UniProtKB/Swiss-Prot annotation:
A motif ('HIGH' region) lies at residues 12-22. This is Methionine--tRNA ligase. Its main location: cytoplasm. Homodimer. Zn(2+) binds at C143, C146, C156, C159. Binds 1 zinc ion per subunit. Its cofactor is Zn(2+).
């Protein structure tokens, strides 16, 4: 059945560039939207710049331009970067729009009419030089707990303490440097606590991931406080109706920005806002967000919608944050990489794929390990997928004038087998289990490459008597390539576009059951260039010179390595260190000698969720045939390593010592492939 679906991503703030951390969310959302479109659903994906607030007002002042000029420029920059990464919005709007003014004020009026708004005086910090009330983050001073200087007005980045700006020692305005004054002002509050019973039920209704719902439960233990939804002039934002000099706090008008973008799109496409947001709408609405804003989307937003008579979202999907090389993105380490910096060096499809391999339906941080990124992108996309087309296309054009065979003959069953996991892969996409989908697709790529190796078209091409067999084999190979490209198309839109142009066919998920037969294709041209290490290295910006290497400073002497026997071993590691190693039970499904290698065996390991290719230095102790079917233990999250003989995707565990070895580790009976060793 065709579904009507509205999809949103969180609104990026119009005060800075898009960076790779942002792109986790927009890539996740875009993949999901593309998959829904691929399955024929009526899917609309909207987003917008979050374009109001004090930081935008102050930055515009510092640049000598108006806030409107700043947000117009940032909107263009953001949309350019999103487009560069293949993010396909149906509309990219702004919260500084007529629709958002109207909708935000309408929601407020409905909440006030229902007695969910109260007004009272509060005391605030005021900058007498700049003439503005200061948000907590615009006050700096000495932490009252640890004494660290130059800390924010609400929290210390050194010791993690939270406090009131009035607790800061020697506070100053970050805007003018003046000492803030304490002044009273009348503020408007949304009575969030009135919705406590409703929210307790709603967050466990299946709309949120269960771990998110449990996190939100913590707020009820201390009680839901009234939410301050007003700010005083001067302020760049939406005026509060019938309240001169008062403006909505940025989150009050950012959340309705989803509705405003929908309304703008509807007006251009003959639809009505009520088709999506009306209380009786049958449409599905899904918000993709980061884990840092679940409070606003899981409590404030549903309460605002409920109190103003609108329908609620169908699903809210939170994701984790991005780290680079195992650490938080950092300007000082050069790992705070913007989208624009990336696009200057590398094809965005590699990053889209890598993000997809890491994502699942849970709220887990993902790491961009640049060495793994290089090996996996080249190994999977170029080595396993694109090379299939380049290997087969030459034979088709040299021997068959670019025309595929009229039948798959005896290999029809092999092709049909490739489609057996198609629906499971589709279910993984739908469930946001992208990592599983990528593993299953790469397992298919391994099958097709094994088919090519077994049938050796380069050998068939030398024998005129095998002309028909050659035609069949390369036709099967190119149809297998089409399967891979179709399954990967939500993740790799540009590669799939080029590949389908080469194959002269349309993107058709359901049409894979009918292979391309007696079909003309174009001559092959490069679809995806390999990444070079120098390109990946160029992503890391040079950090500021450290004192040890600054001009005129002597470098510290390099310590002489200590032999392993003389090195004092640390007898302990923490449980956190051990838990980083993902040990899995694996079944050896194939074992072969490696040509040109004296010590290595090539193992294919079943780890439950797919297979891994591993090169192990155990040839001196084991006959390959004796290993097939045996269970062992592998390190499953070791970064892939490019070797002369191929890509090794993990490590099997073995013991050795003066008495001999290596001896493979084996689990007790009952263990199954994929089980984790804890």
């Amino acid at each position: 059945m065709k579904r009507r679906i509205l999809i949103t991503s969180a609104l990026p703030y119009a005060n800075g560039p898009i960076h790779l951390g942002h792109l986790v969310e927009y890539t996740q959302t875009d993949i999901w939207a593309r998959y829904q479109r691929l399955r024929g659903h009526d899917c609309v994906y909207v987003c917008a710049d979050d374009a109001h607030g004090t930081p935008i007002m102050l930055r515009a002042q510092s640049e000598g331009i108006t806030p409107e000029e700043l947000i117009t420029r940032m909107h263009g920059d953001h949309l350019r970067d999103f487009t560069g990464f293949g993010i396909r919005f149906d509309l990219y709007h702004s919260t500084h729009s007529p629709e958002n003014f109207e909708i935000s004020q309408s929601i407020y009026r409905a909440l006030r009419a229902a007695d969910y708004i109260n007004v009272r005086e509060i005391e605030q910090a005021y900058d007498p030089v700049a003439g503005i009330f200061l948000p907590d983050r615009f006050i700096r001073g000495t932490c009252p707990r640890c004494g660290a200087a130059d800390q924010y007005g609400d929290s210390c980045e050194v010791c993690g303490a939270t406090y009131s700006p009035t607790d800061l020692i020697n506070p100053v305005s970050a805007v003018s440097g003046a000492v803030p004054e304490r002044r009273n002002s009348e503020h408007y509050f949304f009575q969030l606590g009135d919705f406590s019973d409703f929210l307790r039920r709603w967050i466990h209704s299946g709309t949120l991931q269960e771990e998110v719902a449990h996190k939100l439960d913590e707020w009820f233990s201390i009680g839901l406080s009234d939410w301050d939804i007003s700010r005083d002039a001067p302020y760049f934002g939406i005026p509060i109706p019938d309240a001169p000099g008062k403006f909505f706090y940025v989150w009050l008008d950012a959340l309705p920005g989803y509705m405003a973008a929908t309304q703008h799109w509807c007006a251009a496409h003959g639809r009505n806002l009520a088709d999506y947001w009306g209380p009786d709408s049958a449409a599905e609405i899904y918000h993709f967000i980061g884990k840092d804003i679940i409070y606003f989307h899981g409590l404030f937003w549903p309460a605002m919608l409920k109190g103003s008579g609108h329908r609620l979202p169908t699903g809210i999907f939170a994701h984790g944050h991005l780290t680079v090389n195992g650490a938080k993105m950092s300007k000082s380490r050069g790992t705070s990489i913007t989208a624009r910096q990336y696009l200057q060096h590398l094809n965005p499809e590699f990053l889209r794929y890598y993000i997809a391999t890491k994502l699942n339906s849970h709220v887990e941080d993902i790491d961009l390990n640049l060495e793994d990124f290089l090996l996996r992108g080249n190994g999977d996309l170029v080595g396993k997928v694109v090379n299939l087309a380049s290997r087969a296309a030459g034979f088709i054009h040299r021997s068959f004038a670019g025309r595929l065979a009229a039948s798959l003959g005896k290999d029809q069953a092999f092709y049909d087998g490739l489609l057996q996991t198609q629906e499971a892969i589709g279910e993984a996409y739908a469930g946001r289990e992208y990592g599983k989908a990528m593993r299953d697709i790469m397992a298919l790529a391994d099958q097709i490459n094994a088919y090519v190796d077994q049938n050796a078209p380069w050998t068939l091409a030398k024998d005129p008597a095998q002309h028909e067999s050659l035609h069949r084999v390369v036709t099967v190979t190119l149809n297998g390539f089409r399967v891979l490209i179709t399954l990967l198309s939500p993740v790799l839109p540009e590669l799939s576009r080029k590949a389908l142009e080469f194959l002269q066919c349309e993107l058709d998920w359901a049409g894979l059951s009918k292979p391309l037969l007696d079909h003309q294709i174009l001559p092959y041209s490069h679809l995806l260039q390999r990444m070079e290490k120098t390109q990946v290295d160029a992503l890391i910006q040079n950090p500021a010179e450290s004192p040890a290497t600054a001009p005129g400073t002597a470098a510290a002497p390099v310590p002489t390595p200590v032999p392993a026997e003389a090195r004092e071993e640390n007898p302990f590691i923490g449980i956190d260190d051990f838990s980083k190693v993902d040990l899995r039970i694996a079944r050896i499904v194939a074992a072969t000698n490696v040509d040109g290698a004296d010590k290595l065996l090539h193992l294919t390991l079943d780890i439950g969720e797919g297979t891994r290719s591993v090169f192990a230095g155990i040839k001196s102790a084991y006959d390959p045939a004796s290993l097939v079917g045996r269970l062992t233990v592998m390190v499953a999250n070791l970064a892939p390593r490019k070797m002369r003989f191929g890509l090794s995707e993990g490590m099997v565990l073995a013991a050795s010592g003066p008495e001999g070895g290596p001896f493979l580790l084996s689990p007790d009976s009952g263990a199954q492939p994929g089980m984790r060793v804890k």
